[in-house]
Curated annotation (Swiss-Prot):
<dbReference type="InterPro" id="IPR000871">
    <property type="entry name" value="Beta-lactam_class-A"/>
</dbReference>
<keyword id="KW-0046">Antibiotic resistance</keyword>
<keyword id="KW-0732">Signal</keyword>
<protein>
    <recommendedName>
        <fullName>Beta-lactamase Toho-1</fullName>
        <ecNumber>3.5.2.6</ecNumber>
    </recommendedName>
</protein>
<dbReference type="GO" id="GO:0046677">
    <property type="term" value="P:response to antibiotic"/>
</dbReference>
<dbReference type="GO" id="GO:0030655">
    <property type="term" value="P:beta-lactam antibiotic catabolic process"/>
</dbReference>
<dbReference type="InterPro" id="IPR023650">
    <property type="entry name" value="Beta-lactam_class-A_AS"/>
</dbReference>
<feature type="signal peptide">
    <location>
        <begin position="1"/>
        <end position="29"/>
    </location>
</feature>
<dbReference type="InterPro" id="IPR045155">
    <property type="entry name" value="Beta-lactam_cat"/>
</dbReference>
<feature type="binding site">
    <location>
        <begin position="237"/>
        <end position="239"/>
    </location>
    <ligand>
        <name>substrate</name>
    </ligand>
</feature>
<comment type="subunit">
    <text>Monomer.</text>
</comment>
<keyword id="KW-0378">Hydrolase</keyword>
<feature type="active site" description="Acyl-ester intermediate">
    <location>
        <position position="73"/>
    </location>
</feature>
<keyword id="KW-0614">Plasmid</keyword>
<dbReference type="InterPro" id="IPR012338">
    <property type="entry name" value="Beta-lactam/transpept-like"/>
</dbReference>
<dbReference type="GO" id="GO:0008800">
    <property type="term" value="F:beta-lactamase activity"/>
</dbReference>
<comment type="similarity">
    <text>Belongs to the class-A beta-lactamase family.</text>
</comment>
Length: 291
């Protein structure tokens, strides 16, 4: 005859089993993701950094997420956000006009070059920098703020102690291995991007503007977006530089799920290496599987 004590013990074990199996399943899934990212990196011949934040519960998927990578044009998000922050106390700021001279043009200016000998508003410069990765637009934003160090100072004001912007376009894209200039880590960037787009780092109007710019990006179709279901909404900012450096940072709205924040950074040992957007797409597919 089963004693009351034994019955209680069996009930305790039975109640615990689902938790144990659930924990074991999650652990196995995490190991599988890490192994897949490691295999992807090995096949690429480069160095891959990934940070995903699931805002439903703030769980994370991390791979080399505390290592420094050159940001390249993903740093444009911070510069644009810094200008948006200023506009919180000056409602006319984004309409301020900035002169565009031929001597301002650098190596990639798809929007600014159309305004030579004219002007662009700070809002237009923000859109050009984030949606078309216009380098002259980025330099104008940096100049307005007072230099690269002011962009870094804005990051510090958000609690980001890792981000550092040292130069302007196009030299910030040299991405020399081991060079700490113009770098951050995947995790630091993911946390800051989350704060800027989904948190309280910006006021509601400015936050909505930043998200609108990111959703309207024209340069990311072959990167993170390519690894996600077509029905998901994505706002992202790409970046690329020497050493085959290929980056993309994104806020993702899956169907019937809280937003995800994903940072993918990739670089290679050879200075003239080709960009590998396919690696970013593959990484995105791996870490978002199951959402």
């Amino acid at each position: 005859m089963m004693t009351q004590s034994i019955r209680r013990s069996m009930l305790t074990v039975m109640a615990t089993l689902p938790l144990l199996f659930s924990s074991a399943t999650l652990h196995a899934q995490a190991n599988s993701v890490q192994q897949q990212l490691e295999a992807l990196e090995k096949s690429s011949g480069g160095r891959l950094g990934v940070a995903l934040i699931n805002t439903a519960d703030n769980s994370q998927i991390l791979y080399r997420a505390d290592e420094r990578f050159a940001m390249c044009s993903t740093s444009k998000v911070m510069a644009a956000a810094a200008v948006l922050k200023q506009s919180e106390s000056d409602k006319h700021l984004l309409n301020q006009r900035v002169e565009i001279k031929k001597s301002d043009l650098v190596n990639y200016n798809p929007i600014a070059e159309k305004h030579v000998n004219g002007t662009m508003t700070l809002a237009e410069l923000g859109a050009a920098a984030l949606q078309y990765s216009d380098n002259t637009a980025m330099n104008k934003l940096i100049a307005h703020l007072g230099g690269p160090d002011k962009v870094t100072a804005f990051a510090r004001s958000l609690g980001d102690e890792t981000f550092r912007l040292d130069r302007t376009e196009p030299t910030l894209n040299t991405a020399i291995p081991g060079d700490p200039r113009d770098t951050t880590t995947p995790l630091a960037m993911a946390q800051t991007l989350k704060n800027l787009t989904l948190g309280k780092a910006l006021a509601e109007t400015q936050r909505a503007q930043l998200v609108t710019w990111l959703k309207g990006n024209t340069t990311g179709s072959a990167s993170i977006r390519a690894g996600l279901p077509k029905s998901w909404v994505v706002g992202d900012k790409t970046g690329s530089g020497d050493y085959g450096t290929t980056n993309d940072i994104a806020v993702i709205w899956p169907e019937n799920h809280a937003p995800l924040v994903l940072v993918t950074y990739f670089t290679q040992p050879e200075q003239k290496a080709e960009r590998r957007r396919d690696i970013l797409a593959a990484a995105a597919k791996i870490v978002t599987h199951g959402f």
